[in-house]
Amino acid sequence: VGLDIGSRSVKVAEITETKNGRKLKRFGMADIPPGAIEDGAISDPETVSQIIRQLLKSANIKETNVALSIGGYSVIIKKINVQTMPEAQLQETIHFEAEQYIPFDISDVNLDFQILGENENNPNQMSVFLVAAKKEMVNDYINLVTLAGLTPCIIDVEAFALQNIFEANYDIQDENVALIDIGASKTSLNILKGSSSVFMRDVALGCLQINQKIMSLLDCSYEQAELLKFGEASDKMSAEELKQIVAAVVTDWCTEIRRALDFFYTNYPDDQIKRIILSGGGANLAEFRQL
């Protein structure tokens, strides 16, 4: 069972293995009240755990072992270069290497790494993805799912979890692909060269911006703004006015995404991105897909 806990909703999916491959058996989704989770930090675990319990019940999911992912500014992903060495030796020295790059006390984080291969510019070095997550945040998510009566078996990083889903469903080995996930409060960009991630960036922009603008103009609730955002008619705002609000916010998203892509092209001038894959709630907005 996969559990996706966002800042405005929680999703659950039960996957089974069949002779024809993996099959989606059950799926469910429920809203989370504003403020319960902000930038990945859980402020109201009791409410969120109860929502998860109800969601599992309504989706008729009885399996209690779950895989989940974490994100936000308590998670750091950094591509670094280190002296070429065996993986076992790097395992012993990674804390020392990480101290140069992690803006937290190294004793307060869980560390992991993935060796990407030889550094293209220095054959005596290798490129490594360094991942650090604050222990406090990891423990908060473990406590949350435990409160919901579940057992966390896998805790991944959101960007890597999305990459795994993509690679499991699409056989694209030689293309450069940009995975863009537009959530409620942040947009994540992950650029893949084949099966390797070479560039990641998060920007604090998301669908919540559109809702906030609509709420401010119409003095309405978040739920009403959500319906209007996806095209429900309103006597307080014309379709053209709504389209302009959405277009203005989406233009900001695209500006930040282009900046990130420009940074990628600066570092990889000979590479071209052949395909863009969109996910998250923002992918449902026609204005964004068109830009």
Where are the regions a protein language model picked out?
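Active-site neighborhood for divalent-cation/phosphate handling
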Residues: 69-168, 275
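Glycine-rich phosphate-binding loop plus the immediately following alpha-helix
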Residues: 37, 138-164, 195-237
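Non-catalytic, solvent-exposed interaction/assembly segments
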Residues: 1-97, 139-141, 147-151
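Short hinge/gating elements
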Residues: 34-41, 75-85, 116-119, 124-128, ...
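Helical "lid/coupling" subdomains associated with nucleotide-phosphate turnover
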Residues: 49, 215, 224, 229-230, ...
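Gly/Thr-rich phosphate-binding beta-strand-loop-beta motif of the actin/hexokinase/Hsp70
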Residues: 1-31, 50, 65-69, 168-199, ...
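Phosphate/pyrophosphate-binding loops at sites that engage ATP/ADP/AMP, CoA/4′-phosphopantetheine
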Residues: 52-65, 148, 220, 258-274
